[in-house]
């Protein structure tokens, strides 16, 4: 397969050297959440930024915020498949997704942060899901099937805004947030002067 930047990669043989943040940001800004069944175009990049924002507001460490921003980065290479379809595809899909996610997390240096903060990131992801359902979908509790994963989870207090911008704008915002969080993480890793 060919990336936005013109590089070849094989999803079944993904290695960290195949991963480039510009390709990730570009692809995620174009991939729609929920198979496109939202009121307006809403991308995985926007979702990822929301997850990072939720983590920031909850005073999560910078490493957790960065891992939250990149929690779906592997979808830049294999797409965003809605969860009910993933379940129907079974182990073959799960294995492929896990392998690609591992390569992407290694390349972007968030393997340990994702592991260390996995529960916090997953909770922020579910809060984002509840927020997206509230703000972007025509959900009616009396008409639609329940979303069991959202049981007891409240949406984020802020409504999703700034929806009319182009995918390129969202890719740029994603890259800016990535650079900011990565720089903050690196600064925190430096030994402090006495």
List the predicted regions and their residue ranges.
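Metal-dependent phosphohydrolase cores
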Residues: 1-194
């Amino acid at each position: 397969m060919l990336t936005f930047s013109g590089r070849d990669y094989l999803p079944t043989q993904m290695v960290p050297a195949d991963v480039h943040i510009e390709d990730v940001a570009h692809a995620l800004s174009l991939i729609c959440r929920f198979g496109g069944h939202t009121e307006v175009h809403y991308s995985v990049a926007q979702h990822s930024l929301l997850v990072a924002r939720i983590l920031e507001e909850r005073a999560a460490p910078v490493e957790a915020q960065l891992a939250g921003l990149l929690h779906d980065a592997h979808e830049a290479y294999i797409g965003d498949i809605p969860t009910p379809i993933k379940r129907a595809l079974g182990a073959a899909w799960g294995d492929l997704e896990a392998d690609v996610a591992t390569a992407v997390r290694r390349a972007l240096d968030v393997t340990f942060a994702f592991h260390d903060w996995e529960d916090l990131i997953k909770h922020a992801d579910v809060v984002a899901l509840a927020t997206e359902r509230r703000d972007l979908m025509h959900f009616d509790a009396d008409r639609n099937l329940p979303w069991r994963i959202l049981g007891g989870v409240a949406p984020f207090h802020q409504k999703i805004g700034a929806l009319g911008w182009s995918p390129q704008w969202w890719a740029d915002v994603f890259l800016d947030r990535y650079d900011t969080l990565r720089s903050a993480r690196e600064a925190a890793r430096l030994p402090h002067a006495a």
